[in-house]
Amino acid sequence: MKTKNEPKVILELAKESDLPEFQKKLQEAFAIAVIETFGDCEDGPIPSDNDVQESFNAPGAVVYHILQDGKNVGGAVVRINSQTNHNSLDLFYVSPEYHSQGIGLSAWKAIEAQYPDTVLWETVTPYFEKRNINFYVNKCGFHIVEFYNEHHSNPHMHRNGREDDKPLLNDDDFFRFVKIMKKKD
């Protein structure tokens, strides 16, 4: 439901030809917190090119542009499991110039509305992404249910694709969030 101050957004399916630009904008948005926390992105873009490609090509993946007034202001990659209705938000971003305008919440509500049979949504975010943690918990109603770290690894975490396959920027330190939408019958 759209409130008076909530911007209207539209989800538009991304075409295969859109994916390189989508990836670039996603990585630019993700770089902000990395640079604020670590000072740079010396080891390459976050998420890595390989991780983004894996998300684009995962079974059940759907890639959306987030549009406001006809402008591309962000994007999302969701994975939909129509058998279990346990769905995943793999990647989600709002371009930095559109932050703090309610676009993220409007987009998330549009995603929820697109998949009304969802029983559970799941996502992860790095431990240092305070903005994301606030968004998922305090705005969207997710709950933190797990903390992946060197002592408790994420069995589904994409590796960074480098030859040494070492974690990138504490790659293993992620919070896992879930949002239960409805109880199974």
Swiss-Prot record:
Domain N-acetyltransferase: 9-169
Gene3D superfamilies: 3.40.630.30
Name of one Pfam family that matches: Acetyltransf_1
Endpoints of the signal sequence: none
CDD domains assigned: NAT_SF
Any GO MF annotation of the entry: acyltransferase activity, transferring groups other than amino-acyl groups
InterPro entries named among the record's database cross-references: Acyl_CoA_acyltransferase, GNAT_dom
Recorded superkingdom: Bacteria
Protein name: Uncharacterized protein YrkN
